[in-house]
Curated annotation (Swiss-Prot):
It comes from the Bacteria. This is Probable cytosol aminopeptidase. Mn(2+) 1 binds at residues 273, 350, 352. It holds the Pfam family Peptidase_M17. GO terms for biological process: proteolysis. The gene is pepA. Its main location: cytoplasm.
Length: 500
């Protein structure tokens, strides 16, 4: 999908479909006002007659509108003007994205970013529009026969974003950012949606190496023998049950100054999670292919920042393995030694994400990071606590947590902070090791993060639990690409702060 910005009067633009937004109470933003005037009040009539629902995102398609050069005009409700918010704007954009993805026209002009929104610049509105329209065009048909031919036939190919202001470098950069984030989300979705027999640890490693080759950044892939030499006994305890070899992937994006400390992203890469000997129930176990969505988000974020040529140093770490039962699998009650030297009693082999992450977090120390963020589909408890709207956030540094919360709000990929209090650490006590890998029935998201916190004392660290946000179930089953928007926005903000 190709995006361009153009300063133009919307009623004179020749295109397959022209998109304008208006408020349910009859207030018309500039583009809608111009179309209404040229069509002799047709848009105002829609509102007056109640033909357009008040809810943001409701839409009506008008064909061959007199006085308008476009073949069709898609009129999208922005909701009530007094209630116009980030959510209302995004709801409207989702409606636009669905319409354009349906194949209503191959060429479209979108004039919806002219609606003023408190605290949001035109650049922000254009970036959101680009990202959501591009993301809305995503389809995953890879395993289906005829998928390539079907993909060619669907959706708008060229989108012109119409504005009343002069096109500037800032606005063009905003559109490029939106495209880059959408590309990163698409990669994360593709990896998440692939079945476990395809998206193996080796597949993730190959994907990382292909990205490195495309964007010219370094990639290292450590094998089982390398992990053994490093003393990654915790990670390797998870890999024991599978005949598929684990991989430890390290990506080095060097966009900043040579001596600048990097941001380190660590993504959980369990390519299929049966639970191991602590076997999961069979129902919906197919969705455990999504247990590598943390890894997918790191790879997707790397694609986004590389596409943006972000002036920042970033290291990506992906510990990747399956968690399978087998004759050589780890047993409940086994004690292993992590790379940090701390010992762990494994009371539940289905609490394996923290076991691979802890060694990756110890490995991250060697980079002397500015901060470390790990991303993991870690606990079902997070879904119980927060549902499927925000990701869970826990951190050992309040400023880092606040920064992530802010970037989540800006990107629409929000998180909610949970406590990381010392009192929870007592729940991880073990009679036979330095710690247990589970903390009991209550506060599971917090105790999982408390476990990880024991391996992050050397740096500022935040943990994103994306168990509720990485994918959706039901008829629309599929990976969401989250939290690529949050991570990308965070890194853009970090790069901007260094430039100031």
């Amino acid at each position: 999908m190709e995006f361009t910005i153009k300063t133009a009067t919307p009623e004179k633009v020749r295109t397959g479909v022209l998109v304008v937004g208006l408020f349910a109470d009859g207030i018309l933003p500039p583009a809608a006002h111009a179309v209404d005037k040229a069509s002799k009040g047709k848009l105002a009539q829609l509102v007056k007659r109640g033909d357009l629902d008040e809810k943001a995102g409701a839409a009506v398609m008008l064909h061959d509108l007199a006085g308008i050069a476009a073949e069709r005009v898609l009129v999208v409700s922005l909701g009530k003007s007094a209630e116009f918010s980030d959510k209302a704007y995004r709801d409207a954009l989702n409606s636009v994205a669905k319409a354009l993805a349906s194949g209503v026209a191959k060429v479209a002009a979108v004039a919806i970013a002219d609606a003023e929104l408190d605290g949001r610049t035109l650049a922000w509105r254009l970036q959101q529009a680009t990202r959501q329209i591009a993301d809305g065009a995503y389809r995953f048909d890879a395993p289906k026969a005829g998928a390539k031919d079907a993909k060619k036939e669907r959706g708008a190919r060229k989108i012109t974003l119409l504005i009343g202001d002069k096109v500037s470098d800032e606005l063009e950069a905003a559109v490029r950012r939106g495209q880059a984030v959408a590309e990163g989300m698409a990669l994360a979705k593709d990896l998440g949606n692939l079945p476990g027999n395809v998206c193996t640890p080796a597949y993730l490693a190959d994907t990382a190496e292909a990205l490195g080759k495309q964007f010219k950044f370094d990639v290292e892939v450590l094998e089982r023998a390398d992990m053994e030499k490093l003393g990654m006994g915790s990670l390797l305890s998870v890999a024991k049950g599978s005949h598929i070899p684990p991989k430890f992937i390290v990506m080095h994006y060097k966009g900043g100054k040579s001596k600048a400390k990097p941001v380190v992203l660590v993504g959980k890469g369990i390519t299929f999670d049966t639970g191991g000997i602590s076997l999961k129930p069979g129902a919906e176990m197919d969705e455990m292919k999504y247990d590598m969505c943390g890894a997918a988000s790191v790879l997707g974020t790397f694609k986004a920042i590389a596409r943006m040529a972000l002036p920042l140093n970033v290291v990506g770490i992906v510990p990747a393995t399956e968690n399978m039962p087998g004759g050589n699998a780890t047993r409940p009650g086994d004690v292993v030694t992590s790379m940090s030297g701390q010992t762990i009693e494994i009371l539940n082999t289905d609490a394996e994400g923290r076991l691979i992450l802890c060694d990756a977090l110890t490995y991250a120390e060697r980079f002397k990071p500015a901060c470390v963020i790990d991303i993991a589909t870690l606990t079902g408890a997070c879904v119980v606590a927060l549902g499927k709207i925000p990701s869970g956030l826990l951190a050992n540094d309040d400023d880092l947590a606040a920064e992530l919360l802010k970037r989540g709000t800006e990107s629409g990929d929000r998180a909610w902070q949970l406590p990381l209090w010392d009192e929870y650490q007592d729940l991880l006590k073990s009679n036979f090791a330095d710690m247990a890998n589970i903390g009991g029935r209550y506060g599971g998201t917090i105790t999982a993060a408390c476990f990880l916190a024991r391996f992050t004392k050397a740096y500022k660290w935040a943990h994103l639990d994306i168990a509720g946000t990485a994918w959706v179930s039901g008829d629309a089953k599929g990976a969401t690409g989250r939290p690529v928007p949050l991570l990308a926005e965070f890194l853009v903000g970090r790069a901007a702060a260094k430039a100031d």
